[in-house]
């Protein structure tokens, strides 16, 4: 029985601060303002052939399912289902239906689905701090083109995991996404403010079903570590944003469509870590190099290019874009003058200055 006195099947009193395993079919009736919370010390397991927890929501004035503990949905050997759905449409209360600051683990035989008629607004509607997926997670709103976001702080998606969302995914500040398989599908990954957002790509073309990655607001940062060849469909800069890129030796990261949010964007940069020539490229776009900056004429925007070697020292050289017909992209290269070239240039300058001084008439 809940603390408010409302019976919710056989679930223990909310907040749950012990370990409890669902082996049958249990329900949270949020449409009747019956909410459920997993506390700091709570562990909620959904294990078994017919094990299912259904969370019915009927408003978003406050979260229907929340907590800071752990939820395990299925495992490597046990089935388990977590179903979040609505009883019908309702007026937008501008809060999260799920607001989970703990961890939700979806095992290999687990299934976590979100569906129903939830409000459409430019903001989060579901929020999970830590989401680990070995099984299946799906988000399918009843209304097409729903503008709300599914906020995921830290994501671990295994090689066999499937994460399909018909609404945008928002990475919270300083989040880490470890992607090992290509089962990730969503219209967009939105990058919110934070100084250490990271996406680790541990295989080839793992984000081919993500239409674009966008900086959502000013001052964003994202580092992409590509450990294999990857092509990103799109990437959008906003003002005061930095994209950090690290590509393993012999691999290539390509952004097919590099975009700028609008014509007022400024102070943006791409930083390359442990840089090697040929490791990064962009699709067939109307761009060119000016000094140590990439110029995008469609929005009259300059993107600073900064490269570091393996020791973290800045590489000073001449940038160029070279067309690669195999990948249909412009590959970035930086030519660093050899020490001998520097010596010749410096020697020439010294000789020029000496001759100039000799020819300068003496003052009277």
Q: Whereabouts are the PLM-identified features?
A:
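Extracellular/surface-exposed low-complexity segments
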Residues: 1-30, 102-106, 203, 242-337, ...
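A short, hydrophobic C-terminal helix/tail in secreted or cell-surface proteins
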Residues: 338-356
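Surface-exposed loop/turn positions within long extracellular repeat scaffolds
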Residues: 5, 10-17, 27-67, 77-79, ...
């Amino acid at each position: 029985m809940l603390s408010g006195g409302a019976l919710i099947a056989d679930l223990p009193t909310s907040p749950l601060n012990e370990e409890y395993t669902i082996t049958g079919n249990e329900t949270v009736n949020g449409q009747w303002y019956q909410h459920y919370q997993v506390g700091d010390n709570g562990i909620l397991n959904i294990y078994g052939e017919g094990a299912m927890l259904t969370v019915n929501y009927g408003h978003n004035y406050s979260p229907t399912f929340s907590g800071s503990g752990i939820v395990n949905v299925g495992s490597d050997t046990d089935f388990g289902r977590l179903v979040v759905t609505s009883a019908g449409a309702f007026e937008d209360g501008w809060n999260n239906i799920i607001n989970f600051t703990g961890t939700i683990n979806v095992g290999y035989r687990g299934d976590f689905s979100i569906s129903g008629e939830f409000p459409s607004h430019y903001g989060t509607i579901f929020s999970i701090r830590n989401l680990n997926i070995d099984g299946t997670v799906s988000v399918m709103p009843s209304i097409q083109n729903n503008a709300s976001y599914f906020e995921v702080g830290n994501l671990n998606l295994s090689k066999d995991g499937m994460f399909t969302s018909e609404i945008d995914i928002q990475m919270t500040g300083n989040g880490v996404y470890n992607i090992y398989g290509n089962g990730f599908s969503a219209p967009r990954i939105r990058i919110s403010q934070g100084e250490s957002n990271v996406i680790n790509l541990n295989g080839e073309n793992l984000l081919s079903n993500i239409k674009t990655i966008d900086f959502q607001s000013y001052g964003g940062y994202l580092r992409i570590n590509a450990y294999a060849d990857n092509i990103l469909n799109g990437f959008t800069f906003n003002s005061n944003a930095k994209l950090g890129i690290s590509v393993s030796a012999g691999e290539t990261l390509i952004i097919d469509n590099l975009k700028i949010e609008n014509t007022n964007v400024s102070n943006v940069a791409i930083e390359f870590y442990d840089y090697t020539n040929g490791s990064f490229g962009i699709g067939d776009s109307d761009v060119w190099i000016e000094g140590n900056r990439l110029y995008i004429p469609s929005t009259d925007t300059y993107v600073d290019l900064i490269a570091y070697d393996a020791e973290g020292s800045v590489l000073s050289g001449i940038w160029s874009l070279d067309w690669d017909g195999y990948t249909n992209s412009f590959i970035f290269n930086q030519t660093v003058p050899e020490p001998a070239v520097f010596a010749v240039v410096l020697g020439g300058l010294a000789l020029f200055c000496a001759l100039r001084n000799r020819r300068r008439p003496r003052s009277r």
